[in-house]
Amino acid sequence: EKELVQRIDRIDYKYLRDYLFQLSLQQSVDSIHDVINSLLIKGEPQYRIYDELILNVLNRIGDLWLNNKLSIADEHTMTETIRNVMYRIHSEISKNNVKIPKKVICMTLTNDEHEIPLVMIQSILDEINIPSTNLGPNVPVPSIESKIQAVNPTHLIISSNYVLDTDTFNSAISRLIKFCHKKDIEVLIGGSGNHLLIEENRSATIELKN
């Protein structure tokens, strides 16, 4: 415990990644939550904790599973543990009544079931008082368009971490770009799918970074 406190004080992400990896294997939701809360109390911004710690651990879990070094049961257990922590943190974020005059819709496209990045995005937006609607993972384009009509957002955030077919992916992005630009809605794309964008789509969207 003393070493953990010292590592958190030094914000030693290399150590903390290994530590959280083991905690997720043990399904220690409370312990992971405590580590992240300690970093937040120290003033670490949420986006850095997510990028340096959570996403890193999730990528490691995914890579080990792809290389048959982690069972599907362990992969599911570890991912679900981290997902539960993210939802708990999101529910605890204090929401200020003063909202910034922006409105965001976020989702993943068809076949992309990665839910955790969406929870992270929504938590960060809540922290800076930007209203957001999380449509969840695996949302078809017509459903996104219907929600845009209903909510009238200023920004559309597409989280893309799994692309089954590049042509279908770019076709969906192109359609959403045209739909959004008619309404002056900015389209942001985050995740590994960014590097699969055709140039026309890349130039018409904003890459979501920290």
Located regions from the model:
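Long amphipathic alpha-helical segments
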Residues: E1-S94
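C-terminal regulatory/effector modules of DNA-binding transcriptional regulators
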Residues: N68-S71, T77, N84-N210
